[in-house]
Every structure is written in structure tokens, then in C-alpha cells.
Curated annotation (Swiss-Prot):
It is found in: Cytoplasm. The gene is arcA. This is Arginine deiminase. Belongs to the arginine deiminase family. GO terms for cellular component: cytoplasm. The active site is at C398 (amidino-cysteine intermediate). It comes from Mycoplasmopsis arginini (Mycoplasma arginini). It catalyses: L-arginine + H2O = L-citrulline + NH4(+). Homodimer. HAMAP family: Arg_deiminase. One of its GO terms (biological process) is arginine catabolic process to ornithine. GO terms for molecular function: arginine deiminase activity. InterPro entries: Arg_deiminase. It holds the Pfam family ADI.
Amino acid sequence: MSVFDSKFKGIHVYSEIGELESVLVHEPGREIDYITPARLDELLFSAILESHDARKEHKQFVAELKANDINVVELIDLVAETYDLASQEAKDKLIEEFLEDSEPVLSEEHKVVVRNFLKAKKTSRELVEIMMAGITKYDLGIEADHELIVDPMPNLYFTRDPFASVGNGVTIHYMRYKVRQRETLFSRFVFSNHPKLINTPWYYDPSLKLSIEGGDVFIYNNDTLVVGVSERTDLQTVTLLAKNIVANKECEFKRIVAINVPKWTNLMHLDTWLTMLDKDKFLYSPIANDVFKFWDYDLVNGGAEPQPVENGLPLEGLLQSIINKKPVLIPIAGEGASQMEIERETHFDGTNYLAIRPGVVIGYSRNEKTNAALEAAGIKVLPFHGNQLSLGMGNARCMSMPLSRKDVKW
């Protein structure tokens, strides 16, 4: 039985809010057990997660998605299914790329040992799990100076970032930090080999070596992409993306809007500052007000290489130019919140909700004031506990990549 249900016809995402049909997630595996205090900054975590509770919280998140009739695809299952369906050449290539990309860099001797260890796995799922989790000297039964022979990929539960669904295509990303760059191995593999994904157009490729991550990529409607200029995504990357989209005749977007946000390491993407939750409702952090800056790319009349043109509108005017109506702007923690309340709920990704249909969102229960403000604005909130998951610095949007949404009737 395929990880995809019978309704799935390929990547189809033309909004942030259309009814969610199919979504990619990843329950944190053994990889989070290899986070140590000395490596928190390097591995991009604010604290060590309590593994059992983190997995319990993620299961609650997935259960809420399934309760809303959403086809939930687990990343391990997708990669394992792709591996089973792939040619022997593609299987070998996956393992060789894993060995070449490994951190720490493997000696030739260790490459042989790790290759044999991986190929000895009895099931494709077991193989994928160990590739994601990291490999220790105890796994291999060898002597070495360090316990980890291959580092873990502990950020994989943030499935939003390695690639983004854009219309009927994808952008596969070059991620800012080395610890996350290895994650795109799995994105490249499934989109190159899975029968239901192999014909998906690519609008960006990690070989382009300019940083972009999925938390900065938004599809506001059929015409407009919105991309964050953030701690992880550069304006020159957006310019290259605009060029690629214009060159690809399968892509029909007419405009890209780039939005500058604070360059904070703990709030690293646009979706930690501003999100679209309904046809006219947007949630934002007031902390970003003095930093917001906007650029327009004209994909219709901007030539083969559209350039950014600074847009001097305020946030409200910019959003109105996209949705053609006055937007409702909801601040984190609600109107009249104290600076302390705004800072606390911004810190725990208070904008980072996942819309599962117009005006219905899922996110952490801990951001109580923001949840109340959304309910007061007519947004239905489906809360779940995320006290451990949030220590990885992401909320429901970060932990999900929509693969298919129904089109919105605007």
C-alpha cells in the first residue's frame, strides 16, 4: 500500500490556506537522542529534547491532522517506499551520496565499513532510519576516537525546510548550515525516483549553492509567491528563483514579493514573523514592524531575469495589493499585549500555525494569548502540546510540508 492515498495526483499547492489533502511530516527519531549540550548551537537547538515526550507530542499533532481527513505521509515511509521502487543504480547512488556528504568527513576505511553496514540492513525502512539517526562506533563495532562516526540529522522533523511545494512543482533547497544541508539528500532522492513525484518540475536545486529554506517560501495565491529574506534566505537567492520560474513554462506565477524580516538565529524564517491563516487574515509579530521591507519581482514583464524593485508600501498596503481586499492583521498575543507577552509568544513561534483549510489552523497550545486572539478574530485553532518540540525552534508550519491542497475559491 502506497504512502499516498488514491486522491493524490502529484504536487498541487496554490495557496497557504486551501483545504489540506496531503502533507509530509517526520516524527523525531533516534537522531534527537544524539543531541548533546556542547553541540546545541551547532545542531540548531535551544535545549535538549526529552525524546519520549517529543514523540508523544508529535503523535498528537499527526492525530489531529488525520482527524481532519488529511493524508499524512511520514518522511521515513516515503523514502523507504521510493527506495523499494527505485533501480539498483538509484539505490547505490543514494548510499554513495550519503557517504560523500557525511559529517564528520569519512575516511576511505570508514566509508567501506559504513557502506557495508548500510547494505546489510534487512529492510529499506531500517536503512532510512539509520541514515537519518546517525551512526555510532557501537553500531559498527569498531574502535574510534569519537562515538559518532556519522552525525545525526536532528532537524528532520521540520519537514518544511529542505524543499517547498510551489504550484505543481518544487524548490529543493541549499540550506544555510551544514547540519541541515545533508537533509536534502532525501528530497532529491524521492523527487528523482518515486513514480508519483518523478515528473515534478524543479524550480530550484541545491547545486545552485545560494541559501534558501522552506520556512521562507509562501504561496499566497495562483499568481503570487512570497519569499522571506531572513537569517536563512538571501535576496540574491530570490532573484535567482525568479529567473528560474520565468524560464520554466510550466510555472504560471506572475509575481514574487520578497519580505525582509529580522535576522535572528532562533526566529530564522518568514513564517516565524508573518503567516497567512485565512483569505484575508494574517498573523504577525510586532517585533518585526521596524524591519519589514518589501521588494517586487515582475515575472510577466520583468524580462528573463526579473530584478527586485523596492516596494514602499506598509505591510497592510502590501498585503492588500496581493489579496485585493483590506487585510485583517492580528498581532501575536493580541491587541494591547505587553512587550513581555509579545516576546514570549514570538519566541515560541507564535505566528507559525499550519492552516488546514481557510480559517482553521493547528499550532501549539502554549501560545495561549495568540490562540485567544485568533479565536476572537474568527480563526478556529486546533491546539496541541509542543513543550518539547518547540525547543527545536519551530511550530506546526515548520513541522509540515503540504504536498496537495484543494484550490481556494477566492
